[in-house]
Regions:
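A short, Lys/Arg-rich alpha-helix, primarily the initiator
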Residues: 1-19
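DNA major-groove recognition helix of helix-turn-helix
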Residues: 31, 42-43, 53, 61
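Acidic, glycine-anchored loop motifs typical of Ca2+
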Residues: 86-89, 106, 112-128
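Short, charged recognition helix plus adjacent turn
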Residues: 70-99, 152-169
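Generic structural signal for well-ordered, non-transmembrane alpha-helical segments
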Residues: 55, 95-105, 129-143
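Short alpha-helical DNA-recognition segment
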Residues: 19-41
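DNA major-groove recognition helix of helix-turn-helix/homeodomain DNA-binding modules
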Residues: 52-70
């Protein structure tokens, strides 16, 4: 690898390449379809990457989180609808999931009361929003677990064939 950059505020694509200890030239060879000049412009935020480039980087840099980062922060549709997922340790993911599920268990009867008549009355809105937010936290935790699993697979920590055997049954 060439010299390591001492630049501050490196973007996620710059950090992903550097974590692989690749120069832009070597990264370009690995990525096959992205020239070094384009990599530099993406890393220096002079150019927005295309979605297909993100897919290639995520695969070749072994960073599935790059797809979520792109969707949540750079795609105009994703910025509105896709929450950014932060990679966490499995124990933290599980504890957050259990906390949210326990909270929802307590709120389940209230959700039934609110939705029984098919409409949300004024005095039900606050509880409904709280429940909706808790469900969103569960959804984010599920996505975090999925992303964690993908990362473990690409890094060889989970046997991909065995994982897919059970996932696809």
């Amino acid at each position: 690898m060439g010299r390591v950059s001492n630049k501050e505020n490196k973007n996620v694509y710059f950090e992903a390449r550097e974590s692989m200890k690749l120069s832009r030239e070597k990264a370009s060879e690995l990525l096959e379809s992205i020239p070094p000049e384009r990599i530099e412009r993406i890393e220096n935020e002079k150019l927005m990457p295309h979605p297909d480039e993100i897919l290639i980087m995520a695969e070749k840099y072994k960073r599935p989180d790059l797809c979520n980062f792109y969707c949540a922060n750079q795609c105009s549709i994703g910025k509105q609808y896709v929450p950014e997922i932060k990679i966490k340790e499995l124990s933290q993911i599980v504890l957050e999931m259990l906390a949210s599920l326990n909270s929802m268990q307590k709120r389940k009867d209230r959700l039934i009361e609110i939705s029984a008549d098919g409409q949300i009355d004024r005095d039900e809105i606050e509880d409904f929003i709280f429940i909706q937010e808790e469900l969103e936290r569960i959804s984010i935790t599920v996505e975090t677990l999925r992303l964690w699993s993908e990362k473990m697979i690409v890094n060889g920590m989970i046997d991909e064939a065995e994982y897919m055997k059970y996932k696809n049954r």
